[in-house]
């Protein structure tokens, strides 16, 4: 196993892919993701963004619901599991990597502590954040806390601080019932596969984005890794 990990790291470096170790947090602010704006990176198209129903695609030039507009994150950008692997989306700040290099890039994370140590998750970066530090992935999990911005209030009528605490969100699975039905699967995922892990550390390596994610975001880097 150690040999495999070392070889994987060597291959990643040889291919010019980013790898390292870092931390995770969680959020779901309902805002239009930063990578949904055009011109952020060399991609096929910006990350799909939606009307207030969370399902209907809206033009990428539409202002964010967190800034007086009508564009919000799409419901299908919540996390899920296929086989033994978790999949989802994240805001990220990676040391030495500007947004032009991280938008719509994908990373495989291997968690290194808490109850999910050893579990793997692949995320596509769709957002950035002024409150994130180097090698920090903020996982998009409904009910995970709105953080700085609360677009969930205008989109779904959420409380002024979002569901639960502003940072960290709800604290029990039963509170997932406070969320709209369309967001509960991702909320429950946190208490299932993710085992309610609280900000686990991880190691990450950039990987080619799986179609299971790009079909949802509609964003692919050009050229991709």
Swiss-Prot record:
Q: Where is the active site?
A: 29 (nucleophile), 138 (proton donor)
UniProt keyword annotation of Membrane present: no
UniProt cross-references to Gene3D superfamilies, sorted A to Z: RlpA-like domain (2.40.40.10)
Record's keyword annotation contains Transferase: no
Q: Which cysteines in this chain are paired by disulphide bridges?
A: 30-152, 31-66, 35-103, 50-74, 104-219, 106-209, 176-187
Q: How does activity depend on pH?
A: Optimum pH is 3.5. More than 90% of the maximal activity is maintained between pH range 3-5. More than 60% of the maximal activity is maintained between pH range 2-8. About 80% of the maximal activity is maintained even at pH 2.5.
Q: Which reaction does it catalyse?
A: Endohydrolysis of (1->4)-beta-D-glucosidic linkages in cellulose, lichenin and cereal beta-D-glucans
First-level EC class: hydrolase
Superkingdom of this protein's organism: Eukaryota
GO BP annotation list = cellulose catabolic process
Q: Sorted alphabetically, which CDD domains does this protein's record hold?
A: DPBB_GH45_endoglucanase
Thermal dependence reads: Optimum temperature is around 40-50 degrees Celsius. Has more than 50% of the maximal activity between 10-70 degrees Celsius, and more than 30% of activity at 0 degrees Celsius. Stable at 50 degrees Celsius for 30 minutes. 60-80% of the maximal activity is retained between 0-10 degrees Celsius. Displays 40% of its maximal activity at as high as 80 degrees Celsius. Remains active at 60 degrees Celsius for over 8 hours. Approximately 50% of the activity is still maintained after 4-hour incubation at 70 degrees Celsius.
Function summary? Hydrolyzes carboxymethylcellulose (CMC). Also hydrolyzes lichenan and barley beta-1,4-D-glucan. CMC is hydrolyzed majorily to cellobiose (G2), cellotriose (G3) and cellotetraose (G4). Cellohexaose (G6) is hydrolyzed to G4 and G2 with traces of G3. Cellopentaose (G5) is completely hydrolyzed to G2 and G3, and G4 is partially hydrolyzed to G2. Does not hydrolyze G2 or G3. Does not hydrolyze crystalline cellulose, soluble starch, xylan, mannan or laminarin.
Q: Which family does it belong to?
A: Belongs to the glycosyl hydrolase 45 (cellulase K) family.
Q: What is this protein called?
A: Endoglucanase
Q: What is the lineage of its organism?
A: Eukaryota, Metazoa, Ecdysozoa, Arthropoda, Hexapoda
């Amino acid at each position: 196993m150690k040999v495999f990990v070392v070889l994987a790291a060597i291959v990643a470096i040889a291919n010019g892919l980013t790898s390292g170790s870092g931390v995770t947090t969680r959020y779901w602010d309902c805002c239009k993701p930063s990578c949904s704006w055009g011109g952020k990176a060399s991609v096929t198209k910006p990350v799909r963004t939606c009307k207030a129903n969370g399902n209907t695609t809206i033009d990428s030039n539409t202002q964010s619901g967190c800034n007086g507009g009508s564009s919000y994150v799409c419901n299908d950008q919540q996390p899920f599991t296929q086989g033994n692997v978790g999949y989802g989306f994240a805001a990220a700040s990676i040391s030495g990597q500007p947004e032009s290099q991280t938008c719509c890039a994908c990373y495989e994370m291997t968690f290194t502590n808490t109850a999910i140590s050893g579990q793997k998750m692949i995320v596509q970066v769709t957002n950035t954040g002024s409150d994130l530090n180097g090698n920090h992935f903020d996982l998009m999990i409904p009910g995970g806390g709105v953080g700085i911005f609360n677009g969930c209030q205008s989109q779904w009528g959420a409380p002024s601080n979002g569901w639960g605490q502003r940072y960290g969100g709800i604290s029990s699975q039963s509170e997932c019932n406070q969320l709209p039905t369309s967001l509960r699967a991702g909320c429950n995922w946190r208490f299932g596969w993710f085992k309610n892990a609280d900000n686990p550390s991880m190691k990450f390596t950039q990987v080619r984005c799986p179609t299971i994610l790009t079909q949802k975001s509609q964003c692919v880097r050009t050229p991709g890794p």
